[in-house]
Amino acid sequence: ISFSSCMAKINTPEIPQSFNQNAVVTSGDFSFECEICKNEESVSVTVKNTNALGLVMTYDGENVNFKYNDYSQNILGENFEKGNTAIIVYDVMNALCDENTKKHIIDGGVKYEGKTNFGEFILVQNDNSTLKSLAFKNSDYKIAFK
């Protein structure tokens, strides 16, 4: 009698070095739609509705740049509020490489649990490597990716 062993291979989605996804950002009673674009150097958030329609916030790990129509200004990131969406996404994506960040295979994707300056986060990624959601344990701030 011969027994063949078969191992189920779990395909883990790659952590995207760059992506471009629409999302809804919610903090308390306030929410806005945006496009979040990450490349190897920075994260940009383009606001798609509310009074800030068209505002682009870009964070490169040091500076936050605000661009609105012809207006553009750089602000040192450390002097800026940690709740800025571009800073939050940038820091979370960098934290995914941290050895303390936990990775769990879940139905339909992967759940990452880690920590940034903003707090402890839970990031859920779909099987196709797109992002699904980002939430923080001690905050009502969350991002639902489309």
Language model segments and positions:
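Residues that act as N-cap/strand-start positions at coil-to-secondary-structure junctions
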Residues: 28-30, 39, 51-53, 106-108, ...
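Short polybasic amphipathic segments
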Residues: 23, 62-67, 131-134
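An acidic-aromatic
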Residues: 36-95, 139-141
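Bacterial signal peptide processing site
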Residues: 7-10
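Short, acidic/polar N-cap/turn motifs at the starts of alpha helices
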Residues: 22, 33, 54, 63, ...
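A short, Trp-centered hydrophobic/proline-enriched beta-strand micro-motif
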Residues: 13-30
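Gly/Pro-enriched, hydrophobic low-complexity segments
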Residues: 44-49, 99-146
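C-terminal motif of bacterial Sec signal peptides marking the signal peptidase cleavage site
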Residues: 2-5
